Amino acid sequence: MVSFKLPAFLCVAVLSSMALVSHGAVLGLCEGACPEGWVEHKNRCYLHVAEKKTWLDAELNCLHHGGNLASEHSEDEHQFLKDLHKGSDDPFWIGLSAVHEGRSWLWSDGTSASAEGDFSMWNPGEPNDAGGKEDCVHDNYGGQKHWNDIKCDLLFPSICVLRMVE
């Protein structure tokens, strides 16, 4: 198998011309700087999307750009996303949901959030699945500005992530 990487300017062209990208299909081809408008942090590129969307529409928007809604696997990532959210106190979508069969918490990039020892940043008393209809998660909520489970059809800004290859 032949292995190659596209320079950053071609990577941007490829990602921006794709309607939907299967998980990670193009990311392995990209090297160097993040696409224009994205911010690099620890070998990942992040895009703050100010337009308010439902959780599903936010995820589809991230897929359109070749990524997923952002996942948080450390305190550092959690703080970085909050800082990237333009210093706003408003909540924003992250890639955590229980919308799939089995209803355990999974990140939209396929990584688990339910196993013992996994990083979590739930507000006290969360997740509470109020009314049995809270299957998606937004960050920067409540007094502590952490995670909250909420209805997926509400509208919030979001943050997308692309994983880069070294």
Curated annotation (Swiss-Prot):
Residues of the signal peptide: 1-24
Limits of the C-type lectin domain: 41-161
Keywords: Antibiotic, Antimicrobial, Disulfide bond, Hemagglutinin, Lectin, Secreted, Signal
Localization: Secreted
Gene3D superfamilies reported in the protein's UniProt record: Mannose-Binding Protein A, subunit A
An annotated GO BP: defense response to Gram-negative bacterium
Disulfide-bonded cysteines: C34-C45, C62-C160, C136-C152
Any matching Pfam family: Lectin_C
Alphabetical list of PROSITE patterns matching this protein: C_TYPE_LECTIN_1 (PS00615), C_TYPE_LECTIN_2 (PS50041)
Cellular component, GO annotation: extracellular region
Other facts: Binds lactose inhibiting its agglutination activity.
Reported function: Involved in host defense at the body surface. Causes agglutination and suppresses the growth of the Gram-negative bacterium E.coli K12. Possesses calcium-independent hemagglutinating activity.
PANTHER family reported for this sequence: MANNOSE, PHOSPHOLIPASE, LECTIN RECEPTOR RELATED (PTHR22803)
Quaternary structure note: Homodimer; disulfide-linked.
Protein name from the UniProt record: Lactose-binding lectin l-2
